[in-house]
Design a protein with these regions (language model features):
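Short amphipathic alpha-helix that is part of the acyltransferase structural core
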Residues: 1-30
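Conserved acetyl-CoA binding element of GNAT-fold acetyltransferases
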Residues: 62-80
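Conserved acetyl-CoA-binding loop-helix of GNAT-fold acetyltransferases
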Residues: 78-94
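Conserved catalytic-core motifs of GNAT/GCN5-like acyltransferases
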Residues: 107, 123-136
Length: 136
């Protein structure tokens, strides 16, 4: 079955993504921390089963940020999951280019996901040691 991609909807954050972050033991980011209040990304499906999703921040420079990649931990088709993640990152990256970005940035810790980004032409920048966030 072919995979399909669609934009995130108003309810995907609560209905799907929060559960996925929980499956992986991660704290979900606040909805208003994400692009377009949680709707600024895309989701990949295998039929009616959601596999993975991710976000794209656009900036006031030529930089786009592709991040917050998350997947359904219990989706068991390993090869299709890998392909879905590649498709997700590739499509988000393509969208960045279409809207005028010259550079695409990502902050990733997961080694498997780092490998996916590298396979798609991303190169490693500096290794960071701390994420710094301040809530105003």
């Amino acid at each position: 079955m072919a995979l399909t991609i669609r934009e995130l909807s108003e309810t995907d954050y609560e209905d799907i993504l929060v559960e996925w972050w929980g499956q992986w033991g991660w704290e979900p980011p606040q909805k208003d921390f994400l692009p377009n209040d949680g709707k600024g990304g895309i989701i990949v499906y295998d039929g009616d089963v959601p596999i993975c999703a991710g976000y794209m921040y656009l900036t006031n420079s030529k930089v786009g940020w592709v991040d917050w990649i998350i997947s359904n931990k219990y989706y068991t088709k390993k090869e299709l999951r890998k392909y879905a993640l590649e498709l997700l990152v590739s499509r988000l990256t393509e969208i960045c280019g279409l809207v005028g970005c010259k550079y695409v940035y990502a902050l990733i810790k997961n080694q498997s996901l780092i490998k996916t980004y590298e396979e798609l032409g991303y190169i490693k920048g500096d290794s960071y040691t701390s994420e710094m966030i301040k809530v105003l």
